[in-house]
From Swiss-Prot:
Keywords: Cell membrane, Disulfide bond, Glycoprotein, Immunoglobulin domain, Membrane, Phosphoprotein, Repeat, Signal, Transmembrane, Transmembrane helix. The lineage of its organism: Eukaryota, Metazoa, Chordata, Craniata, Vertebrata. Disulfide bonds join C42-C100, C143-C201, C245-C288, C330-C372, C416-C482. Its main location: membrane. One of its GO terms (biological process) is cell-cell adhesion. Residues 689-700 have a biased composition (Polar residues). It is a single-pass type I membrane protein. Residues 1-19 form the signal peptide. This is Kin of IRRE-like protein 2. Homodimer. Interacts with NPHS2/podocin (via the C-terminus). Interacts with NPHS1 (via the Ig-like domains). Interacts with FYN. The gene is Kirrel2.
Length: 700
């Protein structure tokens, strides 16, 4: 106030002093918010005339209330030269260049530019208030501020009060130089954790430093987030395991797929999988793939499976020369890893521990089978073993087989067994007269056969046989050499042929002849008894075989005439009338009951049997060679004994069913019953003293 009064006083003083009109205060550029009041000052000194304001060169008028401009007026004391222009409320059209003019004095103030500021409105987020994005996929959010704000607003992004970087600003200007559309795009790659997050777009300018905010909520679509677990995680082979596949997803899960070692598990559906654990689960993980409309996710896990030894690499048999080094290797797997030991087949001494066995400078006795044994470090997991053979290459090993003694001018056989690795190139028999490798030479013949496999890894073997036909005296004094050769050397053995005398054989032949003679006499006696008995009886004859059930029921107590110890083969005879004119054919033996039928006569004989029921035969000769026929094999045809010849007056002898039944029998010159002296019993042999051997009892 003091300054204003001083200014007025100076103007009056100058006026009184005759000074010219001048501006005491001129308007200046100013900025005003839309809707508020604008005041442009103007003060003149030493002037008492008309004062007016122009807007962009257009006179507003000289009246204080400025008719026609309802929001405009001039204020201040005109006597003191104060002419301030007021605009209220300011609108966008008020933005112009204003001058204060003293028309009568020809004074014009400098132009004053009035700027109208328009505060920005709340920005718009495209797609808001909830924007859907895909987790893991790059996306963007666009914030837009339209037009009428002056100056152009600044668009910023915030999350939880923290400004976000990575935005791009873009502004479009209208033709009238007014601010057009302003956009700010935020680029981001959201994650599933951003689901439901709130982001703010803020528009601020000089007209509104605090700015205006618009919030947007993120709604994320994301593929399943999977967690895979196994219960129990550590399991022994053969036990059950349950896998659980849990997933969160937006949109919801549409399917599950299980795989083991990359191969689908057929029939597996849903979030659970039950299996029986085996060793493969340790190296072939189980995976669970979960899908929805956005995508899929996969998780896998491997079990800690405890299992016993499993052979991965079997030891291989080796063949080395004597004196060289040999080695075997075998690979076992297991969980936990098994202990591996090496032993020799049939032995318990541990030769080595670990997957490899080394044998330096092998000898012939090192040949054989070696065992690689795997033992689990945990009980209840089982074990395993594998074996391989070591073959030691060496000169052939030749062994003689003890030859059987031979007769002079008889056959002989010499044998040798050859084991060799590598196989022998040749096996040769040599003696004084020459040598022979294969085939025949005079009285000599060589054959070869594979030898049975033996333990020790001596390589394949063969048996070489030298046959001699018609031995000579020199053969029993000569040494026969069997030799074999391969690339490593030669092996040989000498064999001498033993001689056999004929004296034991003669004794055996004599004994056999004596036995045959005795047996023939017994058969002849039986035949004579049957003939004499047949002439006095008219009933059928039945000869009972001991142990047979036939005819046992037809024997009465009166027929037993001796003790069971002394009784020999029992002959029971039943007679029937036969005539020579009958034409019935002779029947052969019935195999179902053991009888012979000759024109109604049934005969069953068992003669020559031992007391125990067996047929006595002389033992075979003990001097026979293996595979050669037994000399003097006495086996007469005693299984069929001819039936007794039946006699009747005016009838001839009947034919027998066996052609050899009575080869030594002489046909009598006359027919009829034998003449008996008076007092002679019907059976002459009944008066004889009991024989020392089993007797033949006859029952009528």
């Amino acid at each position: 106030m003091l300054a204003s009064a001083l200014l007025v006083f100076l103007c009056c003083f100058k006026g009184h002093a005759g000074s010219s009109p001048h501006f005491l205060q001129q308007p200046e550029d100013m900025v005003v918010l839309l809707g508020e009041e604008a005041r442009l000052p103007c003060a003149l000194g030493a002037y008492r005339g008309l004062v007016q304001w122009t807007k962009d060169g257009l006179a507003l008028g000289g009246e204080r209330d400025l008719p026609g401009w309802s929001r405009y007026w001039i204020s201040g004391n005109s006597a003191s030269g104060q002419h301030d222009l007021h605009i209220k409320p300011v609108e966008l059209e008020d933005e112009a260049s204003y001058e204060c003019q003293a028309s009568q004095a020809g004074l014009r103030s400098r132009p004053a530019q009035l700027h109208v500021m328009v505060p920005p409105e709340a920005p718009q987020v495209l797609g808001g208030p909830s924007v859907s994005l895909v987790a893991g996929v790059p996306g963007n959010l666009t914030c837009r501020s339209r037009g009428d704000s002056r100056p152009a607003p600044e668009l910023l992004w915030f999350r939880d009060g923290i400004r976000l970087d990575g935005s791009s600003f873009h502004q479009t200007t209208l033709k009238d130089k007014a601010t057009g559309t302003v956009e700010n795009t935020l680029f981001l790659t959201p994650s599933s954790h951003d689901d439901g997050a709130t982001l703010i777009c803020r528009a601020r300018s000089q007209a509104l430093p605090t700015g205006r905010d618009t919030a947007v909520t993120l709604s994320l679509q994301y593929p399943p987030m999977v967690t895979l677990s196994a219960e129990p995680q550590t399991v022994q082979e053969g036990e059950k395991v349950t896998f659980l596949c849990q997933a969160t997803a937006q949109p919801p899960v549409t399917g599950y797929r299980w795989a083991k070692g990359g191969s689908p598990v057929l029939g597996a559906r849903g979030p659970r999988l039950e299996v029986v654990a085996d060793a493969t689960f340790l190296t072939e993980p189980v995976s669970c793939e979960v899908s929805n409309a956005v995508g899929s996710a996969n998780r896998s896990t491997a079990l800690e499976v405890l299992y016993g030894p499993i052979l991965q690499a079997k030891p291989k048999s080796v063949s080395v020369d004597v004196g060289k080094d040999a080695s075997f290797s075998c690979v076992w797997r297991g969980n936990p890893l098994p202990r591996i030991t090496w032993t020799r087949m049939g032995g318990s001494q541990v030769l080595s521990s670990g997957p490899t066995l080394r044998l330096p400078s092998v000898a012939l006795e090192d040949a054989g089978d070696y065992v690689c044994r795997a033992e689990p470090r945990r009980t209840g997991l089982g074990g395993g073993k594998a074996q391989a053979r070591l073959t030691v290459n060496a000169p052939p090993v030749v062994t003689a087989l003890q030859p059987a003694p031979a007769f002079l001018r008889g056959p002989a056989r010499l044998q040798c067994v050859v084991f060799a690795s590598p196989a022998p190139d040749s096996v040769v028999w040599s003696w004084d007269e020459g040598f022979l490798e294969a085939g025949s030479l005079g009285r000599f013949l060589v054959e070869a056969f594979p030898a049975p496999e033996v333990e020790g890894g001596q390589g394949p073997g063969l048996i070489s046989v030298l046959h001699i036909s018609g031995t000579q005296e020199s053969d029993f004094t000569t040494g026969f050499n069997c030799s074999a050769r391969n690339r490593l050397g030669e092996g040989r053995v000498q064999i001498h042929l033993g001689r056999r005398d004929l004296l034991p054989t003669v004794r055996i032949v004599a004994g056999a002849a004596s036995a045959a003679t005795s047996l023939l006499m017994v058969i002849t006696g039986v035949v004579l008894c049957c003939w004499r008995h047949g002439s006095l009886s008219k009933q059928k004859n039945l000869v009972r075989i001991p142990g047979s059930s036939e005819g046992s029921s037809s024997r009465g107590p009166e027929e037993e005439t001796g003790s069971s110890e002394d009784r020999g083969p029992i002959v029971h005879t039943d007679h029937s009338d036969l005539v020579l004119e009958e034409k019935e054919a002779l029947e052969t033996k019935d195999p179902t009951n053991g009888y012979y039928r000759v024109r109604g006569v049934s005969v069953s004989l068992s003669l020559g049997e031992a007391p125990g029921g067996g047929l006595f035969l002389p033992p075979p000769s003990p001097i026979g060679l293996p595979g050669t026929p037994t000399y003097y094999d006495f086996k007469p045809h005693l299984d069929l004994v001819p039936p007794c010849r039946l006699y009747r007056a005016r009838a001839g002898y009947l034919t027998t069913p066996h052609p050899r039944a009575f080869t030594s029998y002489m046909k009598p010159t006359s027919f009829g019953p034998p003449e008996l002296s008076s007092g002679t019993p019907p059976f002459p042999y009944a008066t004889l003293s009991p024989p020392s051997h089993q007797r033949l009892q006859t029952h009528v």
